[in-house]
């Protein structure tokens, strides 16, 4: 959770929307390979008009003390989160996309969007489990010489991502945890 002051009512509304739209009960295999009796399909919220607006607003509030020019992460989970932040009220913040690997054709880029040379960036994710997705994006950005100031996520599953991200020397913030969704 963020140490910054965020709108409590907006956060509660987002939690309700995610419970309604994105929590799917039934056995699933997570990206970590572990089994769970529910799945949080946050894309159902990040691609929902009202929830997306709340996500953009709240993540801007949660990271207001971090200095960054652009926001993005590993495609696909990070894409709508980044654009929600980009379109939220406030200063101009560009968005970018990090591919899992560089394209084999065209410009053969791994990082798409505006030129990030000399820019500071925030890496985002819809849901963190192991921290591998945001750290894959962090590695690609660092390899390209881009400074990453932190990682932020909509929902943290409390399965160690915070520790893995901290081990990379990055601060980490989340809007919601499992208890906020009635899943602890």
UniProtKB/Swiss-Prot annotation:
It catalyses: orotidine 5'-phosphate + diphosphate = orotate + 5-phospho-alpha-D-ribose 1-diphosphate. GO terms for molecular function: magnesium ion binding; orotate phosphoribosyltransferase activity. InterPro entries: OPRT, Or_phspho_trans_dom, PRibTrfase_dom, PRTase-like. Its cofactor is Mg(2+). Pathway: Pyrimidine metabolism; UMP biosynthesis via de novo pathway; UMP from orotate: step 1/2. Signal peptide: none annotated. Its EC number is 2.4.2.10. GO terms for biological process: 'de novo' UMP biosynthetic process; pyrimidine nucleobase biosynthetic process. Keywords: Glycosyltransferase, Magnesium, Pyrimidine biosynthesis, Transferase. It comes from the Bacteria. 5-phospho-alpha-D-ribose 1-diphosphate binds at residues 99-100, 103, 105, 125-133. Orotate binds at residues 129, 157. Belongs to the purine/pyrimidine phosphoribosyltransferase family. PyrE subfamily. Homodimer. HAMAP family: PyrE. Catalyzes the transfer of a ribosyl phosphate group from 5-phosphoribose 1-diphosphate to orotate, leading to the formation of orotidine monophosphate (OMP). This is Orotate phosphoribosyltransferase. It comes from Corynebacterium glutamicum (strain R). The lineage of its organism: Bacteria, Bacillati, Actinomycetota, Actinomycetes, Mycobacteriales. The gene is pyrE.
């Amino acid at each position: 959770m963020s140490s910054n002051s965020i709108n409590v009512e907006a956060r509660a509304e987002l939690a309700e929307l995610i419970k309604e739209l994105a929590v799917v009960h039934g056995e699933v295999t997570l990206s970590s390979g572990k089994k769970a009796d529910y799945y949080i399909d946050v894309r159902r919220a990040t691609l929902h008009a009202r929830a997306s607006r709340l996500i953009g607003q709240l993540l801007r509030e949660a990271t207001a003390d971090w200095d960054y020019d652009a926001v993005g992460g590993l495609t696909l989970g990070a894409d709508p989160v980044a654009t929600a932040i980009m379109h939220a009220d406030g200063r101009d913040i560009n968005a970018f996309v990090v591919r899992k690997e560089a394209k084999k054709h065209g410009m053969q880029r791994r990082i798409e969007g505006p030129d990030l040379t000399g820019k500071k960036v925030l890496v985002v994710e819809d849901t963190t489990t192991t921290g591998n997705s945001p750290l894959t994006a962090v590695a690609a950005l660092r390899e390209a010489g881009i400074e990453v100031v932190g990682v932020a996520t909509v929902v943290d599953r409390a399965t160690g991502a915070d520790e893995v991200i901290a081990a990379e020397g990055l601060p980490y913030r989340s809007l919601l945890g499992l208890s906020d969704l009635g899943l602890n």
